[in-house]
Amino acid sequence: NTAFVAVNTSESYVKPSGKLVSVNMADGSITGTCDLGGQPDSTAHDAAGSFVVIAIENERDEDAGDGRIGQMPAGWVSMVSVADDLADCATLKTTDVTGLAEIGADDPEPEFVDVNGLNETVVTMQENNEMVVIDANGTVISHFPAGTVDLVRIDTEDERAALDFTGEQMGRLREPDGVQWLDDDHFMIANEGDMDGGSRSVTVFKKDGALVWESNSEFETPIIQSGHYPDKRSDAKGAEPEGMEVATFGDKTYAFILAERASTVSVYDVTDAASPVFKQLLPSGIAPEGVIAIPSRNLFVTANEADLIEDGGVRSHVMVYELQDAPAQYPTLTSEGMDGLTGWGAISGMVADEDGMIYAVNDSFYGYQPT
C-alpha cells in the first residue's frame, strides 16, 4: 500500500541532498520522510517489503573541469527498514563503497540497485565501471570491474545520412546502468555507458564476478533490422540499453531491456540465466526510461520521458503491453535474412514479390553518397 520515492533535493553538485518519501498509494498522501544526506538515483526493496535500499549517487557535474569523476562528495548505498508500511528513519544505515573500483576509487557513483531472494543487493557504479554486491547487513560481499567488450559490425560514424555497420570498437568499457537479478546467483546489466564507455550490449554475471553471457553487438541487430537504429547516435553509444525489468510469467522468466535512443524494448527469455534467448523487439514511446512488470495480469508497462510538444510531437506517456499466446504483432517489416546487416528507415516506396519479399527504397533522408 506504500510507495517509497527517492527525491533529489540537491541545491548543487557539491551540496547534494535528498529524501525518501513514503506515499500512501490509496490516497496519495505523504506518510513519512527520511533525510538521505545525499542525491539518490534509484531504489529497490526485498520481496517481503521489509527494507528499502537506495543508491546515493552524488553525481558529477559534466560541465565542471574535464567532467570526469573525482568530484566530491562520493556516493554510497543506504538501507532503511520498513515497519507498518513506513520507512523507519532511525534504522537508516550506509555502506561505504569507496576504494573498491579501479576507476575513480575515491568517488564512487552508485547508479542502480536490485535485491534478490537472499536479500542481497547488487549495485552498478556506472562511471566507475564496477559491480558491488552487498548483504542484508550492509556488508560488501563481492565487487569486481564490469570489464570491456569487443564490438564489431557497428556504426561508429555520425554521417546523419548513412547506415554503415562495418565499424569496430575494441575494449569498450561496459559502464552499466540498469541491473536486475535473474535468480539468486546471476544478474543482468544494461551497458549504456556514460563517461568513457557504453558497449551497446547486455551482460550476465554471477555474483562472484564470473562472466556468464555477453550479447556483444548482437543486442543492436534486431533494432537495426527493424528500422529503429538511431543513426545520429552512431559516434556516441548507439542504441543505449539503459533500464531493465525481469519478471516471471507462468513458467518463463523474461528480461525487458529499454533502449533509450532507439525507443524499443528488447525481450529475452532468461529462464536459463546462463543462456538468454532473444524473443522479440517491441516499439516503445520516445526515450523509454522506466519499466515495471505486472505478471498477475500478463502485463508490463514502460514510462517514456521525451516530451516533444514544442516540436508538435507527442507528450511523455506510458505504454502497456500484454503477453499473448499468439504470433508477434511487431515488427511488421524487417531486413532479417538479407545478406549482411542492413539498416533502413524513411521508406518511400514498396512493392511485393510473389514469394513474400518486399522491395523498398529509402527516401532522400538516407542520401549519403559513398566516396
Give a label for each model feature:
Residues 1-371:
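Sequence/structural signature of beta-propeller domains
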